Amino acid sequence: LGWTPGRKDREKVEETIKEFSLQHLALRHTDELSGGELQRVHIARALVQEPQILILDEPTSSLDLKHQIEVMKLLRDISHQGITVIMAIHDLNLALRYADCFVLLKNGNILSMGGEEVITEENLQVLYDVRINRIDNGSHIYVVPEME
């Protein structure tokens, strides 16, 4: 193909490595990285390409709680830089802490779309076929499935 990275490409990579505090990982093979480290590397790799939109499928799956929070904070920071972040995520409590807009999909169709007001017990019961309690403590909203 004949393409090799130029000076600007290398500078952008170095800048992104520093921005994401990945210097200690730069020379390691990806099979040596933890799930959280690998996810940060994948996101950084995508950002080097300077996208306007970042589309992610379950970016926090298989991560421990610490790394889930790190990845979600990172994605929130990216969105504050003017990059649109669209993600599929099934952890509603995590989504409620970090997302600005929700699109609830059922069988490939939009069930509801909007802010946290669309996260209702009724919508979630239709969506998951499980009774769910929505708890608003004044500062955060939580969803908890009812146990039989």
Language model features by range: what are they?
Residues G6-L25:
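Conserved ABC ATPase "signature" region
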Residues I89-H90:
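H-loop/switch region of ABC-family ATPase nucleotide-binding domains
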Residues E121-E122, L127-E148:
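ABC ATPase nucleotide-binding domains
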Residues V103, N107-S112, E117-V118:
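Conserved switch/coupling elements of ABC/ABC-like ATPase nucleotide-binding domains
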Residues L54-E58:
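Catalytic Walker B motif of ABC-type/P-loop ATPase nucleotide-binding domains
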